[in-house]
Amino acid sequence: MTTLQQPQATESHNTDVALSLQNVTISYGNFEAVKNVYCEIPRGKVTAFIGPSGCGKSTVLRSLNRMNDLIEGCSLKGSILFGGVDLYGPKIDPVEVRRRIGIVFQQPNPFPKSIYENIAFGARINGYTGDMDELVERSLRQAAVWDECKDKLNESGYSLSGGQQQRLCIARTIAIQPEVILMDEPCSALDPISTLKIEETMHELKKSFTIVIVTHNMQQAVRVSDMTAFYNAEAVEGGTGKVGYLVEFNDTDKIFNAPQQQATQDYVSGRFG
């Protein structure tokens, strides 16, 4: 199946919800990395995943467009619904999932191609037949990097600074017209000025896309997100590892100013993490 549209499913699902995680447990071999996650990610908002290292937040993020399929031994129980359709259903094409739900990684990773082709290449292989020049410009503008790139579109993407490369990667993701954009610590390798540009870009992008971001920077979560999910991890009984779990999911203002769980209060106040 190469489409995620199933009329019988989309009739009943909540259109305000972009992604619905229902009792999701993700394992690597016999090790449960994160378990029993229930979460509804709202459409047209920025949702932040926060928590200490090893709590499973990036694992959950990558499950939202099946990037974890590329990791040997990784498996998922439960369901993730997108438009009322289970992304892990037996007839779902993972490539189509990744077109509809794009991802931007921690380290900028432009293609070894020109700036122009970084945008055009993915659109072309996904069947885009419109005005490519217009698409390239529109995508670069949406990612707030057009002014830096417009006079050197034929130069290598590697000629850009780190922050510009990351915005180029965002533009590349936008070009294939996804509905959701996942961002896995997109600013962790960037300087403060580049980070600010990415954050400003996110505020504009949420007018057109649903965004889910993993960040270790709690101030960033406060600045950019509408909703925040706090993950934590606990030691496995009788084992040596830790299993991640979702502690609390709420409006960002409530998570940081009036959390319902003591563990959330301890984390956002800097008592651990």
Swiss-Prot record:
Subcellular location: Cell inner membrane
Residue ranges of every copy of the ABC transporter domain listed in the record: 19-258
NCBIfam families (alphabetical): 3a0107s01c2 (TIGR00972)
Swiss-Prot/TrEMBL catalytic activity: phosphate(out) + ATP + H2O = ADP + 2 phosphate(in) + H(+)
GO molecular function, one term: ATP binding
Top-level division of the source organism's lineage: Bacteria
Alphabetical list of CDD domains matching this protein: ABC_PstB_phosphate_transporter
Keywords: ATP-binding, Cell inner membrane, Cell membrane, Membrane, Nucleotide-binding, Phosphate transport, Translocase, Transport
Gene Ontology CC terms: plasma membrane
Function: Part of the ABC transporter complex PstSACB involved in phosphate import. Responsible for energy coupling to the transport system.
Disulfides per UniProt: none
Broadest EC class assigned to this enzyme: translocase
Protein name listed in UniProt: Phosphate import ATP-binding protein PstB
Coiled coil residues, start to end: none
Gene Ontology terms describing biological process: phosphate ion transmembrane transport
Recorded topology in the membrane: Peripheral membrane protein
Ligand binding (ATP): G51, P52, S53, G54, C55, G56, K57, S58
